[in-house]
Amino acid sequence: MRRLLVLLLCLGGCGAQAAEQGVKVISPQRLPLEGGQLALGLSQDWRQPLPGVERALIIVHGRLRNAQTYLHSGQSAAGQAGQSTTTLVIAPQFLNQSDIARHQLPDALLRWKGNGWMAGEPSVSPQAISSYAVLDAILQRLEDRKRFPALKEVVIAGHSGGAQVVQRYALSTGSHPELEKAGIGLRYVIANPSSYAYFDAWRPVAFEPASCPGFNDWKYGLNQLPAYAGGHSPAQLEQGYVTRDITYLLGQQDTDPNHPALDKSCAAETQGAYRLIRGHNYFDYLVRRHPQGLLQRLVEVPGVGHDGDRMFTSPEGQAAVFK
């Protein structure tokens, strides 16, 4: 009975406790960035030319910052799709200060405050670099035709907290003309995030705005935009976002309104009770605002709840990433 109680308690809180104590595994590779270094995992050594790589999959971890777990999920998905040799999987790791302390990591490694990396906040040391600018830097490296002469497309995918990163990045990033010039496509796969950034004050759940004063602030809305957005107006950001090629990948069983990792803030609750309905509400909102020409789609994954590995290795996940 005591063991059962410990297990039940752990389901509710051990993940968060582990995250506060620092991530277990630090990714082994490094990407130099403006006087600092990003920790990341790679499925192939990109320090040398990779003439056989046709697709790069940038896969973003969730709040536990377990980048190596997501790297392995990406590799498994590529293997099941028969595309291991032609796919470079890249898993950036957004460390925080507890990770640095736990592993006694060097000062050069970039780290963020708490979960601020999800919203594009700048790193706190050794340089102030937005987590979204990190994705820009990875894309910039992939533009190099000497290293990647056969690259055809880049897919940026994330699950849970990582999906929040991908959704907000797709919204706040500008165009990538060098990718376009090189003939390299860019797609996004957003899997089971807790929340989305809306374009205006409308929300699918009725509420009293006075009781939730930050409901329309970034990262839930477009008030108080981050510096990374570069002074663009909400209208400009929306117009850019709806031109992106995006797949919203939702687990049909991700329906627990009390899931321990679900965002239960009032700003998130205005979007729906659980992740599946929040995703449907947001996609319906997009279609109403842009009934013509939307290059986006919603795909449900049967029998899967809040599980990143099962989402990306499912037939629907493989089709979204490797179509």
Language model regions located:
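Active-site glycine-rich loops that stabilize anionic/oxyanionic intermediates
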Residues: 61-65, 194
